[in-house]
């Protein structure tokens, strides 16, 4: 798979923290394990503002994580396993987290799906969002590519964020891919340009009616069906 796992360490937190003026520093720790308490303590001591727990599979893991943090910083749960979906009601009943982010890539693999946006078109993300909204827990999902890019254009995904009342998203690698752009000045300019375009598009989406957002949902379903069909045909050697 075309994925990247950054080899960061606790020392990187100390380097980045002093450079931040407005942004909060979010640190994703390892999935819950026997060394998690020690890792969380070190991450907090280094200056993390928010800690993200990935790949959790039970309400007990979430409780252990929240107990380990002990209110010393904000917490976000990365919901990216089928087991997490199945125990979400219990997790929400326990409460204590600051926010939840739905990770579409690993979650679609957990369900054995072909394309991660199937989780939007088949209603899974919507059901999860409604549950979190009902409990008053801030939430978001997936990653956003730069406008005009992605298997499914980023514009359509952004409209779904608004329809589902999502308040946060992760920028995908394609938003500003440092594999292809190495010069730091060019990276900054590209990021600023893409960010400005995104904000301008958001202003347009804010004015969309419920009918327009619902129409986009159905168009996503149609587009996803075609994308999935094409991916399956390619996998099976058809053209």
Residue ranges of model-derived segments:
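Expand to "…catalyze enediolate/carbanion chemistry for C-C bond making/breaking, isomerization
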Residues: 1-239
């Amino acid at each position: 798979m075309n994925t990247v796992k950054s080899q960061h360490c606790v020392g990187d937190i100390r380097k980045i923290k002093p450079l931040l003026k407005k942004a909060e520093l979010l640190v994703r720790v390892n999935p819950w394990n026997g060394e998690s308490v020690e890792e969380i303590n070190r991450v907090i001591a280094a200056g993390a503002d928010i800690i993200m727990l990935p790949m959790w599979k039970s309400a007990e893991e979430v409780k252990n994580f929240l107990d380990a943090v002990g209110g010393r910083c904000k917490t976000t749960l990365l919901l990216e396993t089928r087991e997490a979906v199945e125990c979400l009601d219990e997790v929400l009943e326990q409460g204590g987290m600051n926010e939840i982010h739905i990770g579409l890539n690993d979650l679609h693999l957990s369900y054995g799906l072909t394309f991660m946006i199937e989780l939007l078109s088949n209603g899974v993300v919507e059901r999860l969002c409604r549950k979190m909204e009902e409990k008053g827990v801030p939430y978001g999902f997936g990653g956003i590519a730069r406008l005009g890019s992605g298997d499914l254009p980023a514009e359509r995904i952004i409209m779904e964020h608004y329809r589902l009342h999502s308040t946060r998203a992760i920028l995908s690698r394609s938003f500003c891919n440092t594999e292809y752009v190495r010069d730091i000045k060019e990276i900054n300019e590209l990021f600023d340009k893409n960010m400005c375009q995104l904000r301008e598009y958001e202003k347009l989406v804010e004015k969309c009616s419920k009918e327009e957002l619902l129409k986009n949902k159905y168009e996503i379903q149609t587009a996803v069906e075609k994308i999935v069909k094409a991916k399956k045909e390619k996998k099976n050697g058809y053209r």
